[in-house]
Design a protein with these regions (language model features):
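A Rossmann-like FAD-binding core segment of flavoenzymes
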Residues: 34-36, 75-92, 99, 169-266, ...
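Active-site substrate-recognition segment that forms the wall
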Residues: 153-155, 159-176, 260-262, 269-277, ...
Length: 338
């Protein structure tokens, strides 16, 4: 990069973190940077509303990705990064194309494979139809006990409780009687991630809705009407709905742990590499949530902008995502659900 040329910033991924970083860089650095996003998809999907979709409360919103990227003052390349050469400052796409960069931001998000064999995975293909079919079976008296569970791995746990509450609400509204709903998780208390006060409130709401809570449960598999759990034993279940396991997509040359996550410092620098950052669900931050991804992206963008000659200096930054979730303004349930 010369004094006359903008810094080439390549962003791998165009989810919340990737788009937020592009927007922040436009605001903070302007023409000092040339931002290119690389992503395989053509749409940006706003996932939070997907929890309500099977119950008729809303639909997952979709936006043309090219328009969002253009509005952020960046360019979009269709593809997926498969390899990183940090010494050469190049990434290689799955089709063999190489792209040079001055600074790289890895914001590729995560994959969502099945966590509990035999269970209905929320976040998998056909989830809306599958949950709709489960509700129909419960209303018909074919399902008497539904267990909602999650793996003991980093994720955003709130959707599990939303699914349980909305299932209870729908079955009550449609006068389906005799269906027991259970939330079985590795947590010691409901949504303990949010702190004691929020956890106590969720426990109260579960009790009001006659939803059983089973703590310290590590789901293994569902078969023959039983959810087998660690460290041993099983729970009776006519149906099981599980959140997926989250795994980072492998990129050769990028330091990743066994789950595919990337370790960074407080500014988002990937440990062990120069001029490579990471933000969003691909990082090893234990909570995976869009608001946290956006804050991480803002932190990274501020550091990149400062390096390019614009914005605030990195010394002024604080890793806002490093604090406990209980200290953040994240409501455990939307007001209309409480």
């Amino acid at each position: 990069m010369s004094a006359e040329q903008p810094m080439r910033v390549v962003v791998a991924g165009a989810g919340v973190a990737g788009l937020e970083a592009a927007l922040a860089l436009r605001e903070l650095a302007g023409d000092l940077v040339a931002v290119e996003l690389v992503a395989p998809e053509s749409e940006f999907r706003y996932r939070p509303l997907s929890v309500a979709e099977p119950y008729g409360y809303g639909e997952m919103r979709r936006f043309p990705l090219d328009r969002l990227v253009e509005a952020a003052g960046a360019t979009l390349r269709t593809g997926s990064v498969s390899e990183l050469d940090a010494d050469a400052k190049e990434v290689t796409l799955t089709d063999g194309t190489t792209i040079g960069y001055d600074t790289l931001l890895v914001a590729t998000g995560v994959g969502t494979p099945e966590a509990v064999p035999g269970a209905l995975t929320f976040g998998g293909a056909g989830e809306r139809e599958a949950i709709g079919a489960l509700l129909d079976r419960a209303k018909a008296g074919e399902v008497k006990r539904i267990v909602f569970t999650r793996p003991p791995t980093p994720l955003w746990p709130l959707p599990l409780y939303e699914l349980a509450f909305q299932t209870a609400e729908r079955l009550t509204d449609e006068l389906a009687r005799g269906v027991q709903i259970v939330v079985a998780t590795p947590e010691p208390a409901p949504l303990d991630l949010f702190g004691r006060a929020a956890s106590d409130e969720i426990a109260r709401l579960l009790e009001i809705r006659s939803i059983e809570f089973r703590p310290h449960v590590g789901p293994l598999r569902w078969e023959d009407g039983a959810l087998h759990v660690a460290p041993g034993g099983s729970l009776a279940a006519d149906a099981v709905v599980s959140l997926p396991r989250l795994v980072g997509e492998p990129i050769e040359g990028l330091p990743q742990d066994d789950s595919g996550f990337v370790a960074t410092d407080e500014l988002g620098w990937v440990l062990g590499l120069s001029d490579v950052y990471a933000a969003g669900d691909i990082t090893d931050f234990p909570v995976k949530q869009g608001g946290i991804a956006a804050e991480q992206a803002d932190t990274v963008a501020t550091a990149i902008a400062a390096d390019a000659g614009g914005g605030r200096p990195p010394a002024d930054l604080r890793a806002r995502s490093a604090g406990p979730v209980a200290d953040r303004d994240v409501s455990p349930l939307p007001p209309e659900r409480a």
